[in-house]
């Protein structure tokens, strides 16, 4: 009896965990009316297309079964014709694919170049701003150096004038 109760508790616990997992997967709100209408419209359409593809497959199999004797009788003519048509189709498809690849690569290069030229004024403006800042900084440093030299010259001139008058001998 205790085993049955324990098994029941285990089952309830597992069921609760599964329920929480499912709740985590499912969306919290119901689909909107437009989503429901879309599903209601596309589901039958998808089924119809699936049925039509099955019918096309069945018709192809029946047609192949009926046409096989004709293919065997006319095979000396049909095989070279089929090879010729197959090679022509392969050539056209290859040409189109290579042309599309070339066109897309040229488009990519043109877009890359266009983006590079659009960014160039930003780089030029940034370089111009840095040059102006460097010139202003150099001018400021030059002015400071000029003032320092002027101050030293004034000190030397004042010190030399006062010291020169006291240190020189006059003969009279």
Swiss-Prot record:
UniProt entry tagged with the keyword Membrane: yes
Transmembrane intervals: 42-62, 70-90, 91-111
One term under GO cellular component: monolayer-surrounded lipid storage body
Location within or outside the cell: Lipid droplet; Membrane
Biased composition (Gly residues): 158-172
Location of the region described as Hydrophobic in the Swiss-Prot/TrEMBL record: 39-110
Region (Disordered): 147-172
Region Polar, annotated ranges: 2-38
Tree of life domain: Eukaryota
Keywords attached to this entry: Acetylation, Lipid droplet, Membrane, Repeat, Transmembrane, Transmembrane helix
Disulphide-bonded residues: none
N-acetylalanine carried by residues: 2
PROSITE patterns (UniProt xref): OLEOSINS (PS00811)
Keyword Phosphoprotein: no
Bilayer disposition of the protein: Multi-pass membrane protein
Gene Ontology terms: biological process: lipid storage; response to freezing; seed oilbody biogenesis
Entry's family note: Belongs to the oleosin family.
Function statement: May have a structural role to stabilize the lipid body during desiccation of the seed by preventing coalescence of the oil. Probably interacts with both lipid and phospholipid moieties of lipid bodies. May also provide recognition signals for specific lipase anchorage in lipolysis during seedling growth.
Protein name: Oleosin 18 kDa
Gene label: OLE18
């Amino acid at each position: 009896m205790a085993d049955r109760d324990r098994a029941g508790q285990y089952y309830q616990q597992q069921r609760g965990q599964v329920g929480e997992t499912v709740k985590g997967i499912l969306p919290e709100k119901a689909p909107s009316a437009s989503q429901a209408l879309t599903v209601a419209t596309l589901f039958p359409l998808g089924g119809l297309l699936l049925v039509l593809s099955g019918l096309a497959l069945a018709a192809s199999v029946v047609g192949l079964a009926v046409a096989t004797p004709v293919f065997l009788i006319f095979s000396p003519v049909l095989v070279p014709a089929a090879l010729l048509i197959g090679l022509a189709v392969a050539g056209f498809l290859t040409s189109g694919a290579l042309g599309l690849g070339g066109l897309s690569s040229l488009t990519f290069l043109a877009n890359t170049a266009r983006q590079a030229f659009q960014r160039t004024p930003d780089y030029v403006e940034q370089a111009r701003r840095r040059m102006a800042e460097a010139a202003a900084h150099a001018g400021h440093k030059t002015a400071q150096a000029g003032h320092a030299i002027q101050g030293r010259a004034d000190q030397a001139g004042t010190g030399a004038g006062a010291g020169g008058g006291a240190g020189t001998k006059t003969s009279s």
